[in-house]
Amino acid sequence: MTTNYGVQFDPFDAKHIFIDYTDIGLFASNDGGQTWHSSSVGIPPQWRNTTYWVAFDPAQRGLMWGAFSGTHDLPRPKMWRTRSPQTFMGGVAVSTDGGRSWQPSNTGLPQDSVTHILLDPSSPVGSRTLYACAFGRGVYKSMDGGKTWTQKNNGIAGDEPFAWRITAGQDGSLYLVVARRSEGKDYSAAGSGALYRSTDKAEHWQLVPLPAGVTGPTGLEIDPRDAQRLYLTAWGQEGESADRNGGVYVSSDGGATWKSLFTESQHVYDLTIDPRHPDTLYIAGFDAAAYRSTDRGAHWTRIQGFDFKWGHRVILDPNDPSRIYITTFGGSVWHGPAAGDPHAHETILTPVPVAHE
């Protein structure tokens, strides 16, 4: 079993699935998850340990980009505790044949762990605008489909920004999550994570205040109906008796003010919005549970049957709206009913196998 960062579906073929793994890299299935094979042909050996993300071109079948790294388990402190993240190896690679083969696409982008990649779907087909998070170096932008990259850190503090995730709103705003670099009980301002917004396609960034006391932001999602409604997830920080300032937070005014929506002792990695029913939200925590809300986070119900200790991210199954995938830290990927099973005594979710065709 291993950690995984996402389950992604080919927009032209929902049975063509990719899983982003640590330690074994990127795996693909052509039959809806019945069989799996490695998708690493052409990836430099020093990049193959971990795939952090995959992005598809929605208008060109077979065209996709991947975020690769020789270092796993980011953004956890154990990975950069003894050395600078700028010594990590990794980069962006492109595939034009649906992941059967890859080619590095790193001109202007230093060899570094790339942890996220975002495509602007409004950019010209054939010359796509892409954004990449380089851990320890910041944000990079390409306006030629990833052939060349330029650093875009204007307004981002620090010499080694732990750029982690980048999200786009319906109004064109970009939000950047910078991971926390402090650990234990030492959370100085210099070691806290951060949230930034850009309204000019990453040319300039402005700091968005985090909720009071929050130092470990992990993800940000935007309501597809309201660009001012933001959901922020966070890992708690060590307290005297329990962790604090973690969980889920919501802002209805673009980040000016925040309200807690979930237990603040929790380590919540990410939040998923159901695009068909945006009032429905999903999260997973470090308490052997995943949760579902149907009222925009006002109330949460445990997804009965899922009980792996370290939950990661919930992904909706496009082949069956009643089912979900749940990625984990160390427990592979799980698949089961979105609403859970009230009669389950133990797990009703089954692990997705990783087997060569």
Where are these regions (language model features)?
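Extracellular glycan-interacting surfaces
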Residues: 1-357
